[in-house]
Amino acid sequence: MTPLSSPLSQYWQTVVERLPEGFTETSLSVQAKSVLTFSDFALDSVIAHPEWLAELESASPQADEWRHYAGWLQEALAGVCDDASLMRELRLFRRRIMVRIAWAQTLSLVDDETILQQLSHLAETLIVGARDWLYAACCREWGTPCNPQGVPQPLLILGMGKLGGGELNFSSDIDLIFAWPEHGETRGGRRELDNAQFFTRLGQRLIKALDQPTMDGFVYRVDMRLRPFGDSGPLVLSFAALEDYYQEQGRDWERYAMVKARLMGDNDDAWSRELRAMLRPFVFRRYIDFSVIQSLRNMKGMIAREVRRRGLKDNIKLGAGGIREIEFIVQVFQLIRGGREPSLQSRSLLPTLDAIAALHLLPENDVAQLRVAYLFLRRLENLLQSINDEQTQTLPADDLNRARLAWGMKAENWPQLVGELTDHMANVRRVFNELIGDDEADTPQEEERSEPWREVWQDALQEDDSTPVLAHLADEDRRQVLTLIADFRKELDKRPIGPRGRQVLDQLMPHLLADVCSREDAAVTLSRITPLLAGIVTRTTYLELLSEFPGALKHLIMLCAASPMIASQLARYPLLLDELLDPGTLYQPTATDAYRDELRQYLLRVPEEDEEQQLEALRQFKQAQLLRIAAADIAGTLPVMKVSDHLTWLAEAMIDAVVQQAWTQMVARYGQPAHLDERQGRGFAVVGYGKLGGWELGYSSDLDLIFLHDCPMDVMTNGEREIDGRQFYLRLAQRIMHLFSTRTSSGILYEVDARLRPSGAAGMLVTSADAFADYQQHEAWTWEHQALVRARVVYGDPQLTSQFDTVRRTIMTTARDGKTLQTEVREMREKMRAHLGNKHRDRFDIKADEGGITDIEFIAQYLVLRYAHEKPKLTRWSDNVRILELLAQNGIMDEHEAQALTVAYTTLRDELHHLALQELPGHVAQTCFSKERALVQASWRKWLVAV
């Protein structure tokens, strides 16, 4: 065993002062001295439990002792009588065994592959032990879940990721998926439950037993987000539901995740075999599938962007050449050829590497280097985490922990360890790039083209000398370009740019200037780009991105030239530069029905319990998607109606995620309202009004929302901290508002306006569905019924959605006096016009002035309220374009008039979108859109001016 280094020997004196009673410096072995100096986690544990230290001193941990974990845990749980004592015993058992593993790992008593096996088997033992105890307890309470034939149904648990692969790290969370075989009901209990309810309750108790922090800590952080539909899906699914999901909706990334899926516990029964057979075709295709290379490349790009965004320096998992790249290399071969080559279907990485070598898919030397690098990185990761039982992959910055790791890795000192690490990661990176890398490089022609601009950038030319490269520009534009370059250089002198940043900037600027200054609008474009560059000059990673990826630079220039709004967004949030790397996605926004799934995948990379990172991730996702929508808008690949569709679907995905996050936080604190125990869903709905309700959002639109619930009076929550059910929903709505409006470094998510709720700002933030119906029928003003025309549920349970739709239909189909309605709608519009219109003398406000968008909206709303009692089909849609179609189809409005209003409406909306992209206000010269305005005014007089 390597003697402790000098810094660690000095630290030992600090450890001596904390030794548990009965132990002295002289009474401890050299092994104990080494472990307790290395790991604060081990030291803290044996201080609390001195008997563990005595046990280790008398007999060292053995390589195969993982075979005894199940028996040891069974003994520990023998006296457990309730959930609280179960939680305590699970936590103590986990800590005791983790100390033994840390001891064996630190002293190299067991090889690194076996350490991974021990860590994984410990987690599996605790999961299965907790499940089995709780299953029996739930059966005593509610009966045994059975299928229609009376066969008892088990809870099957899929361990995902490193747990499934038997490669768990020291301080890891665990990714699980719960399933049960067949539908049915419980039998033999005090009351019957259907199987879905039984397994949901069992799953909730199991997660609590493992995940909830107590005075004894927690067992594992449990992450359930890999299950079908993520947090918005059922906690536990039947086999049939799982099969349907993976056959019909399973995504590529879910297929990759399923490669490592493994059933926990003794799993050779018929149900387990059925589940494995059902999942296998989804994971491994019968044919050779090369499409996975691009998918994995995209996933790697997402991870690289995350590293940049979160500033993850020295990360041995996610960094270039890190653990994740080795996993990606192996997965490429598994997913391309695994359907044909059974030897590639192993869940574990090292056996799969052996199979890759045996099949000659990689050179032997590459495989050998990957194996050595993997074991080196995994040992370093586990040692790093065992210092404080902390989930981290970032190398330490302090001298003590650096000395610990150098000693644990058998290096002379920290620089030697860093040198070895650098060599291993370089080997991994080389293989990765050869297999699925996509690095770009400059061509000789590009170098030659940018050479004259190198002198311009380095200020070696006088103004007259620069004339040849700027000959196509007018004199004033030429002077402006040179002034912008000079001013930018002066600005850089004020910035603390390191040598590497200067070097990258000097490589980048000649190429950037060559591209920008070849344009006729060079001065304008450069004036938009230099603020962005000034914002990132101290962040070398973003300069390197633009320097190393010429394609990204070209897209940056094109987009900034086309839109100051995009230039401003990129300057404010440089992380968006990552979106420029792939033109295939930059100009092709996410499919309208895929935003929720894309966001779910994006959020999986963020710890569920880290609220700050969750808020940041939501905002970053929104900004990236907005950029892609705007880029497609500029490129002409999205017509105006589609722009609004995308912006609306994006907003709905964000609402869904925010409600999920708020709900999770509330339930963790209070439990859920008890009326939900007997049903699926959350008893909650979010209704979108205005532009959101009408699928007509713009780039900077706020969200008009109201919140509904269906909680009866006198219902309490079922958590440890009980509160009134209606109070729960009020706090939920407040939490949602907070998550939307909290300002992070990435700004706010959306401005949310909830004043359209019953009684406006004076009313309750969340309303019961019954109270909402009563208010609409007896108290609401006509303008509130107008607003209801453009309202729809954007998040909610099916039954609440149906209830809202019924109320909306009932209100809209109520017979009204035509003259009274006409007067009230017209007077409301006149009030709005007096308040909002004609603010810009000699200008036309596209939205608020006569003949503008609001007039068209009022015409549509008036006609729906006026005629829906005769033509109930008019209530079907909430957007103006389809309402105008319905008016024509139902004989209310002449088809020619409806089409003309639709064209006018989309033309004006298109102009508003483009003004927003140019960061211009929504008004134009009075001479603009005279044809459209005249048409709208004529229609207004026809329908809303009293005869």
UniProtKB/Swiss-Prot annotation:
GO molecular function: [glutamate-ammonia-ligase] adenylyltransferase activity; [glutamine synthetase]-adenylyl-L-tyrosine phosphorylase activity; ATP binding; magnesium ion binding
Swiss-Prot/TrEMBL catalytic activity: [glutamine synthetase]-O(4)-(5'-adenylyl)-L-tyrosine + phosphate = [glutamine synthetase]-L-tyrosine + ADP; [glutamine synthetase]-L-tyrosine + ATP = [glutamine synthetase]-O(4)-(5'-adenylyl)-L-tyrosine + diphosphate
UniProt-listed CDD domains: NT_GlnE_GlnD_like
Enzyme Commission code(s) on record: 2.7.7.89, 2.7.7.42
CC cofactor: Mg(2+)
Positions of the UniProt region annotated as Adenylyl transferase: 450-947
Annotated GO biological process: regulation of glutamine family amino acid metabolic process
Keyword Nucleotide-binding carried by entry: yes
Keyword line: ATP-binding, Magnesium, Multifunctional enzyme, Nucleotide-binding, Nucleotidyltransferase, Transferase
Record-linked NCBIfam families: PRK11072.1 (NF008292)
HAMAP family linked to this entry: GlnE (MF_00802)
Name of this protein: Bifunctional glutamine synthetase adenylyltransferase/adenylyl-removing enzyme
Annotated organism of origin: Salmonella agona (strain SL483)
